[in-house]
Design a protein with these regions (language model features):
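Structural signature of outer-membrane beta-barrel domains
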Residues: 236, 420, 450-452, 477-483, ...
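Patatin-like phospholipase
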Residues: 22-63, 71-376, 380-385, 392, ...
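C-terminal outer-membrane beta-barrel translocator/porin domains of Gram-negative envelope proteins
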Residues: 412-415, 539-543, 547-677, 681-682, ...
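Hydrophobic h-region of N-terminal signal peptides that target proteins for export
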Residues: 13-22
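Flexible glycine-/small-residue-rich
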Residues: 166-168, 178, 275, 343-347, ...
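Bacterial N-terminal signal peptides that target proteins for export
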Residues: 1-10
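Gram-negative/organellar outer-membrane beta-barrel architecture
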Residues: 368-369, 373-374, 386-552, 627-632, ...
C-alpha cells in the first residue's frame, strides 16, 4: 500500500478527547452498517455523503462488510479514500491464498496449475480445510491498511469508537469485539462458514457476525448514541421464481432470520437508509455490471438521505469535530524500528528456524510492505495455513512484533482432472509430504489414470528452506501412454503403447527460486507395444531395450501464472545421453530447448513468443525422438505428429482479453529444418505451417481452450493444408 495511506496527522487519544468535548454539547450520533458481502460497496456513498455534509459520527458498529467499511472509517479513512481502496481491488486475486508466484520456491512453483483440489492429510487421512480459503490475503490487506495500529488496541481509542460483530462457534453466542487487533477483527467478521476459515481469538473461534446480528443497532445505543443512523443492505425477499439455485435458497433462509432480528431494532433507529438491493447478491464481486449497479444504488440511496441528514443536523445542532476536517488517522507514520520478534503457534517447526527465514531483526526498519513481503516468503513454503502479525509498543519508541502461526499437516493430497480430444479424460492424484520422517526431506508421488497411465515417485532433500543450493534425489517411475506414429503424408501408421519403467538418482541445484538444474543417472526398461504389426518399427528400433543414460534438465520460470500467463519467461532444457559404455542397449544423444515469453500491453493485449530447438544423433529409437505434437507447442498438426530427429519451431500468439476470464486468441507457427532419418517416413525439405484462432476461458475448473487451425498435412506434403480442431480443459499436467 502507498505509504501516504498510513501517515497520521493527530494521535487517536487527542482526537478522541476533542471529539468527546464536542459531543458533550449535543446528542451522540451512532452509525450502524449491516453486512452484505459484495453489497457492502453501497455503504461507501453514504460515508462520502457524511463527509461532504461534515455530519458528525461519534460511534460505529458493523457486521461483516459493514464492519470492514465502518472499521476503516473509524480508523480515520475518509469515504473517498475507502472508495479508492475498494475500487482498486482485483477480487479474483482473493480467490486464492497463494502469494505472488515469484515468491514461491521452485519445488512448489513447478506444481502450480497442476491440480484443482487439495486435501490435507491428518492422521494419514484426507481432510477438508476449515474453509475453502484460509483468508491470508484478506488479513495481509487489512494489516497493510491499518499498520501500525497495536495488537492490544482499545477500539474506543480510534478516532471514532468502534464495535465489530462476530459469532463464536464454540458457544454459539454473539461476540462483540472491542479490543485487540483491528485487522484480525475485520478478518473475523467476514469469515463466512465453510468459505473462509474461522479466526482464533483468545478462547473463541470466530465467524461472520451476520449469522446472529447483521444490523447491530443495540451496540451503538450501548455506546451512548442518542441518534442512530442505520444502513441496511438486506433488501426484500426473493420471489418463488427467483429461488432457482442452492445459493439463492440458502441466502433467502439467512435473509429471513436476519429480517426477524431486525424488526425489533428498527424502532430505535432515527434514520434508516435502505439501498435497493433487489436482484443483487452478496457474491456479486466478480460481475462488474452488478458491482456498478450496487454502487449506483448506494449513490441513489445517499441522494435520497441527504434531506433527512440535513434536517437532523439542523434539529440537533450537529457539527463535526476537527478530526474529520483534518483527515487524521489512527496510528502513526509508515516506518518503525523493530524492537523484538516473538513467534507463537509453531509446533513441528522450530521458532528459531521461522525467525531465521523471516529475516527481520531488532533494530531493522519495518513497514507494512516489508512485513507482508516476508510473510509471503514464509507462506509460500506451504507449511502454514495462515500467518498473522501484531505490533505492540516496545522500549525506546520501537515496536515489538508477534507472529501467530497455524501450521498445516506435513502431508497433502492433490487431485487434478483434464480433458483433451486425444487422451480424453485423464485424472491425476499427487501425494506430497514435507519434513516427514526427516526434517527437510521432500517426498513427491503422482499417479495418472484413465486416458493415460503414469506413476512417479521422488525423494529429495532440499532442506526445510527449499532453497539449499545442492540436494540429492532418487526417483522411480512407470508410464503407459498411447502414442501415434505418422507417415510423411499425415496418415497414422500405427498407435503404440509407450511403456517404460525407470529408476534414477542424482543431484539437484537450486540456483534461484525461478532457476533449477538436475543431473541424474537413470536406468529405463522400455516395453513398446504397437497395436498393429509394422515391420519397420522393429527393424530400426529395439522395442524392449534397457537404456542406461545421463539426463540433465534445467528450468527458468518467472511466469506470473502457470495456467494463464500474462507476463514472464519459461525456459526449459533437456539433455539425454544413452551410452553403450554405461551398459545401454541403444546408443544415442538428444538435446531439446524451449522458451516461452509472455508480455501484456495496455491491460488486455497479451503476446506470446515461443521457440523450440531439438536435435539428436546416433541410433535414436523412434519413441525417443523429440516430440512437439501438441496444441500448446504447434497448432495445425495432430497430436504426436511433429516428431523428428531435428527441427525448430517459431510461434507467435496474440490474446485479446474480452473480460477478466475470456480471451480471443490468434496464433501462427512454423517448423523449420525438419530432418527425419526413419526409413518409413518421407519428407520434403521445407517448412511446416500452422495458423489458428481460438477462445480461452479461465473457468473455476481450469483453463478451457478451443482452437481451430489450418496446417501442413505432413512432412511429405507441407504445402497441402488440412484443418485441425483441439479442445483442452482442466489442469495442466
Amino acid at each position: 500500500m502507498a505509504q501516504g495511506r498510513r501517515r497520521l496527522i493527530l494521535s487517536g487519544f487527542l482526537l478522541a478527547a476533542v471529539s468527546l468535548a464536542s459531543a458533550e454539547q449535543r446528542p451522540r450520533v451512532g452509525l450502524v452498517l449491516s453486512g452484505g458481502g459484495a453489497k457492502g460497496v453501497a455503504h461507501i456513498p453514504i460515508l462520502k455523503l457524511l463527509d461532504e455534509l461534515e455530519f458528525p459520527v461519534d460511534c460505529i458498529a458493523g457486521t461483516s462488510a459493514g464492519a470492514i467499511m465502518g472499521g476503516l472509517y473509524a480508523a480515520g479513512y475518509s469515504g473517498v479514500e475507502i472508495e479508492r481502496i475498494i475500487s482498486g481491488l482485483d477480487w479474483r486475486d482473493f480467490l486464492s491464498d497463494r502469494p505472488p508466484r515469484i515468491t514461491a520456491p521452485f519445488f512448489e512453483k513447478r506444481l502450480d496449475g497442476r491440480y484443482q483440489f487439495e486435501f490435507q492429510l491428518r492422521r494419514g487421512l484426507p481432510s477438508t480445510p476449515r474453509g475453502l480459503l484460509a483468508g491470508q490475503k484478506f488479513y495481509n490487506f487489512f494489516s497493510e491498511l491499518l499498520f501500525p495500529l497495536p495488537g492490544d488496541l482499545v477500539f474506543d481509542d480510534l478516532p471514532i469508537p468502534f464495535r465489530c460483530l462476530a459469532v463464536d462457534l464454540i458457544t454459539g453466542k454473539e461476540a462483540v469485539l472491542k479490543r485487540g487487533s483491528l485487522a484480525r477483527a475485520l478478518r473475523a467478521t467476514m469469515a463466512i462458514p465453510t468459505v473462509l476459515a474461522p479466526v482464533e481469538w483468545d478462547d473463541f473461534l470466530l465467524v461472520d457476525g451476520g449469522l446472529l446480528n447483521n444490523l447491530p443497532v443495540d451496540e451503538v445505543i450501548e455506546m451512548g448514541a442518542g441518534i442512530v443512523i442505520a444502513v441496511d443492505l438486506s433488501g426484500p425477499l426473493d420471489r418463488r421464481d427467483e429461488l432457482g439455485s442452492a445459493e439463492k435458497i440458502l441466502g433467502q433462509a439467512l435473509h429471513i432470520v436476519g429480517r426477524k432480528q431486525n424488526i425489533d431494532k428498527l424502532g430505535r433507529v432515527d434514520l434508516l437508509i435502505e439501498p435497493d438491493m433487489k436482484g443483487l447478491s452478496s457474491s456479486d464481486y466478480f460481475f462488474p455490471d452488478k458491482m456498478a449497479r450496487i454502487k449506483r444504488n448506494g449513490e441513489e440511496a445517499a441522494r435520497n438521505a441527504r434531506a433527512a441528514l440535513l434536517a437532523l443536523r439542523q434539529k440537533h445542532g450537529l457539527s463535526r469535530s476537527p478530526r474529520r476536517e483534518s483527515g487524521g488517522r489512527a496510528g502513526g507514520t509508515g516506518e518503525r524500528v523493530l524492537g523484538s520478534v516473538s513467534i507463537t503457534g509453531s509446533k513441528n517447526i522450530s521458532p528459531s528456524f521461522i525467525a531465521r527465514l523471516f529475516g527481520l531483526k531488532p533494530g531493522d526498519p519495518v513497514d507494512a510492505d516489508r512485513i507482508t513481503g516476508r510473510i509471503n516468503e514464509l507462506y509460500a513454503l506451504r507449511y502454514f495455513e495462515n500467518i498473522q502479525y501484531e505490533l505492540f509498543p516496545g522500549d525506546g519508541g520501537r515496536v515489538d512484533l508477534r507472529l501467530s502461526l497455524h501450521e498445516l499437516p506435513g502431508g497433502n493430497l492433490r487431485v487434478g482432472l483434464r480433458y483433451d480430444n486425444y487422451h480424453k479424460l485423464v485424472a491425476a492424484a499427487g501425494l506430497y509430504a514435507t519434513n516427514l520422517p526427516l526434517a527437510g526431506l521432500r517426498w513427491e508421488n503422482e499417479v495418472e489414470a484413465a486416458g493415460r497411465t503414469r506413476f512417479f515417485s521422488k525423494l529429495s532433500y532440499p532442506t526445510k528452506t527449499l532453497n539449499f543450493p545442492v540436494y540429492p534425489l532418487v526417483y522411480a517411475g512407470y508410464g503407459d501412454v498411447p502414442t501415434r506414429l505418422y507417415a510423411g503424408d499425415g496418415r497414422v501408421i500405427t498407435t503404440y503403447q509407450d511403456r517404460a519403467l525407470c529408476f534414477g538418482a542424482g543431484l539437484g541445484f537450486v540456483l534461484k527460486k525461478s532457476l533449477n538444474l538436475e543431473l541424474a543417472y537413470e536406468t529405463e526398461k522400455m516395453n513398446i507395444h504397437p497395436q498393429a504389426e509394422f515391420v519397420p518399427l522393429e527393424s530400426t528400433s529395439p522395442l524392449k531395450p534397457t537404456l542406461r543414460k545421463i539426463e540433465i534438465t534445467g528450468t527458468l520460470d518467472t511466469l506470473d501464472d502457470r495456467r494463464s500467463p500474462r507476463n514472464g519467461l519459461l525456459i526449459q532444457g533437456l539433455y539425454e545421453g544413452s551410452f553403450e559404455s554405461l551398459g545401454s542397449e541403444a546408443a544415442y544423444e538428444l538435446a531439446e530447448a524451449s522458451g516461452d515469453v509472455y508480455k501484456t500491453f495496455f491491460g488486455k493485449n497479451t503476446l506470446r513468443l515461443y521457440g523450440y530447438w531439438g536435435t539428436s544423433r546416433g541410433n535414436v529409437p523412434f519413441y525417443k525422438l523429440p516430440n512437439q505434437g501438441r496444441p500448446a507447442a504447434f497448432v495445425g498438426l495432430l497430436y504426436d505428429q511433429l516428431r523428428a530427429n531435428e527441427f525448430k519451431i517459431l510461434r507467435l500468439d496474440y490474446a485479446l482479453g474480452l473480460t477478466r476470464i475470456v480471451q480471443l486468441k490468434l496464433m501462427g507457427n512454423v517448423a523449420l529444418g525438419l530432418k527425419d532419418r526413419r526409413p518409413d517416413v518421407s519428407y520434403t525439405p521445407g517448412a511446416l505451417w500452422g495458423l489458428g484462432a481460438g477462445v480461452a476461458v479461465n473457468t473455476g475448473f481450469g483453463l478451457l481452450e478451443l482452437t481451430y487451425a489450418l496446417g501442413s498435412k505432413g512432412a511429405a506434403e507441407p504445402d497441402e493444408l488440412r484443418g485441425v480442431a483441439s479442445l483442452e480443459i482442466g489442469a495442466r499436467f
